[in-house]
């Protein structure tokens, strides 16, 4: 006769009923919690219905006091009181009248239209360093000066070559090695070398 397998549903029902009975026996009242901070001050966060517990005493034998620590508020840069002091600092706005007048003028200079000349005293300078020597100038033409050339020079745009110092080109001299050939010059047998190669 084959062995009867126990039905899994009946086994689960038996365990579930035992668990339900054990849960029903527990008290539904909230636990008494005593909160202690790290600096020694005590605070009571228990429910308003339950009486306040004394220090080191237990209200019930079943529900002991659970001591929890109070969270501390810290900052990553400095302590909390220093952060409050810095936030309460008020700057002295009674500055000099000259400094109050200079700042709007700087802002006024910076906010200008593209076609408006703000800094008229500056000299325009061509800073194209790819061509240091201007194309329209020749070294021979600089020797012969006249009144017309001087007037054109004053009107023309200054070049970067006028302000840059002349640097001599650097030449890296590599000496060639001295070869010593050690053999006696004589007639060479080309046909004999050809026969030795291909025979």
UniProtKB/Swiss-Prot annotation:
Consequence of gene disruption: Homozygous flies for rcd4 are lethal at the late pupal and adult stages. The flies that emerged are slow and uncoordinated. Female mutant flies are sterile. Male mutants are fertile.
Record carries keyword Lipid biosynthesis: no
Locations listed in the record: Cytoplasm, Cytoskeleton, Microtubule organizing center, Centrosome, Centriole
Region: Disordered, residue numbers: 1-23, 36-60
Pfam families hit by this protein: PPP1R35_C
An individual GO BP term: centriole assembly
InterPro entries recorded: PPP1R35_C (IPR029135)
Keyword Zinc: no
Entry GO CC: centriole; cytoplasm
Compositional bias ranges of the Polar residues kind: 38-49
Record keywords, A-Z: Cytoplasm, Cytoskeleton
Composition bias, Basic residues: 1-11
Annotated function: Participates in the later stages of centriole assembly through the interaction with Ana3 leading to the centriole to centrosome conversion in somatic cells.
Similarity remark: Belongs to the PPP1R35 family.
Subunit structure: Interacts with Ana3; this complex is recruited to daughter centrioles before their conversion to centrosomes.
The name this protein goes by in its record: Protein PPP1R35 homolog
Native organism taxonomy: Eukaryota, Metazoa, Ecdysozoa, Arthropoda, Hexapoda
This protein's encoding gene: Rcd4
């Amino acid at each position: 006769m084959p062995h009867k397998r126990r039905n899994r549903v009946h086994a689960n029902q038996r365990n579930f009923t035992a668990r339900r009975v054990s849960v029903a026996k527990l008290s539904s009242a909230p636990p008494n919690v005593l909160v202690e901070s790290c600096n020694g001050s005590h605070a009571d966060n228990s429910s308003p219905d339950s009486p306040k517990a004394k220090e080191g005493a237990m209200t019930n034998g079943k529900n002991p006091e659970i001591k929890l620590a109070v969270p501390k508020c810290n900052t990553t840069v400095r302590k909390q009181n220093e952060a409050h002091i810095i936030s309460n600092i008020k700057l002295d706005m009674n500055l000099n009248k000259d400094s109050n007048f200079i700042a709007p003028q700087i802002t006024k200079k910076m906010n200008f239209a593209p076609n408006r000349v703000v800094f008229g005293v500056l000299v325009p300078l061509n800073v194209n360093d790819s061509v240091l020597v201007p194309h329209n100038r020749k070294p021979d033409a600089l020797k012969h000066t006249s009144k017309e050339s001087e007037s054109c020079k004053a009107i023309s745009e200054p070049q970067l070559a006028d302000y840059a110092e002349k640097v001599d080109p650097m030449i890296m001299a590599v000496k060639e090695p001295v070869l010593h050939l050690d053999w006696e010059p004589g007639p060479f047998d080309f046909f004999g070398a050809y026969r030795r190669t291909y025979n």
